[in-house]
Amino acid sequence: MRRPPRSLHAFIACACLLLASASVALAEDDSPPEPDGIWQGPLLGPVPATLAGGTVIDTATLADAIGPRGAVLIDVLPAQRRPAGQTTPWMPVPHRNIPHSVWMPGIGSGVITAEMTDYFANRLAELTGQDREKMIVFYCRPNCWASWNAAKRAIANGYRHVNWYPGGVEAWQAAGLPTEVSTPEGPGAQ
C-alpha cells in the first residue's frame, strides 16, 4: 500500500492549525470590549477576554500562585440574601471558594458605597502588607462582571500585580481541585 506524500501530511497539519486559530479568534470576538471604567450593567453576562492594567489567568497559573508565591485570593461573589417576604426560617447554602481566599461580597458591584470603597482599600492594604507589587487574584463565577470590576478597582488603587481568574470557582472545581467553606466579610456581608 502506498503512503500519502509528506506534503499531504503538512497540508493537513496546517489546515488543522488554521482551523484552531480561527476558532480561538471567533471565541475572542464573542467577548465584549472592555468598558472605559467599572461595568455598570447586569453582573451576569458575557465578559471581556482582557483586563487592561492586569492579567487574565487560567487554573494552572492560579494553582501555581497559591503555592510558594502566596497570592492574595479574593472571591467577590455576592452573598445570598433571605428572600423578600419570607417569614419562615431560612439558612443560606454554605459558600465554597478556593482555599485561602477572602470572601468580600459586593465589592464587584457596579456602584459601591463610600463605606465599601474605604473597606476595600483598607483590607487590600492589610492583605498585601501594603505591598502594591503583591500578587492579587480576583474571581467569582464564569461570566460574572463582579470579579472584573473588583480587579479594575484594585488597579485604580495602584496595585500593579492584579490578576483576574474569569473561570471562577466552577473552573477550579472542574479541574478536580479542592474548595473550602467560607464566611463573608465586610459591608457586603450584611
Language-model features, listed with the residues they occupy:
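Bacterial N-terminal signal peptides that target proteins for export
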Residues: 2-12
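Rhodanese-like catalytic fold shared by cysteine-dependent sulfurtransferases
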Residues: 2-3, 23-59, 65-68, 83-137, ...
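Bacterial N-terminal signal peptides
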Residues: 11-22
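Structural scaffold elements adjacent to functional motifs in cytosolic proteins
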Residues: 73-75
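Short, glycine/acidic-enriched loop or turn micro-motifs at the edges of active sites
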Residues: 78
